[in-house]
């Protein structure tokens, strides 16, 4: 069973996605929070054994430098630094945001012209999942990144050393459906409360994505960075 996650166009695209959630000016975002979310996202990709392009890892090293500088005690200097990596990054993000917005406008104009001057475009259908309130699989994935980091720390504190690698997505789908037998909704983090190791956590998440994809469950997130709620979309027979 293959579940594809829609890739970002690059590290700046991922960062812009994270920054845009705060709905403030780019220069006013809590940069350390954004950096932590970016690093958690990459850590989740690696834990799920998904390929991470080198450009994302390069950006991660730059972000770790910025984060370390932000967390260090402030030192009063006579002259400001010529090169501020944080300001440079935010400037790049601002420029990328303008470029992306302009490219989207051009793409829409091209589609309008194509309707009048060319044959109907035949598209290769990519089955992406549209969630309530314009949420995407990436939003669920980013929420899961935080849950996984917390679960990983919990398992580490328990000193758990035995791990299985034979969990099946189909079996986890049945377990999730069983969890809905007595209720119509669950919080995303509830699914992982009894997970014994990270392999089970990851397989449960993939099973959740598959159930969303086939419309067995739907997803809601009332506020930005709020709790993810899963709702049952079938009736008990």
Swiss-Prot record:
Subcellular location, record wording: Cytoplasm
Domain of life: Bacteria
Chief location: cytoplasm
GO biological-process terms attached to the record: cell division; chromosome segregation; DNA replication
GO CC annotations, alphabetized: cytoplasm
Pfam family, one: SMC_ScpA
Function: Participates in chromosomal partition during cell division. May act via the formation of a condensin-like complex containing Smc and ScpB that pull DNA away from mid-cell into both cell halves.
Family to which this protein belongs: Belongs to the ScpA family.
NCBIfam families to which the protein is assigned, alphabetical: PRK00104.1-2
Assembly and binders: Component of a cohesin-like complex composed of ScpA, ScpB and the Smc homodimer, in which ScpA and ScpB bind to the head domain of Smc. The presence of the three proteins is required for the association of the complex with DNA.
Name of the protein described by the UniProt record: Segregation and condensation protein A
């Amino acid at each position: 069973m293959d579940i594809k996650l829609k890739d970002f166009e690059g590290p700046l695209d991922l960062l812009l996605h994270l920054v845009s959630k705060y709905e403030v000016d780019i220069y006013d975002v809590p940069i350390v929070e954004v950096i932590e979310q970016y690093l958690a996202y990459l850590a989740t990709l690696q834990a799920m054994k998904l390929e991470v392009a080198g450009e994302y890892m390069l950006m991660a090293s730059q972000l770790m430098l910025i984060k370390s500088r932000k967390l260090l005690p402030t030192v009063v200097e006579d002259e400001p630094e010529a090169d501020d990596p944080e300001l440079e990054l935010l400037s790049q993000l601002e420029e990328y945001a303008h470029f992306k917005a302009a490219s989207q406008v051009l793409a829409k104009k091209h589609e309008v012209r194509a309707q009048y001057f060319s044959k109907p475009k035949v598209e290769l259908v990519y089955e992406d999942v549209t969630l309530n309130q314009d949420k995407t699989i990436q939003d669920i994935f980013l929420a899961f990144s935080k849950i996984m980091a917390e679960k990983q720390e919990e398992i580490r504190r328990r000193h758990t050393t035995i791990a299985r690698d034979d969990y099946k997505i189909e079996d986890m789908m049945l377990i999730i459906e069983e969890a809905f037998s007595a209720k119509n909704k669950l919080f995303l983090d509830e699914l992982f409360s009894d997970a014994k190791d990270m392999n089970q956590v990851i397989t449960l998440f993939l099973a959740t994505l598959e159930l969303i994809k086939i419309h067995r469950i739907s997803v809601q997130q009332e506020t930005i960075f709020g709790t993810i709620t899963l709702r049952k979309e079938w009736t008990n027979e």
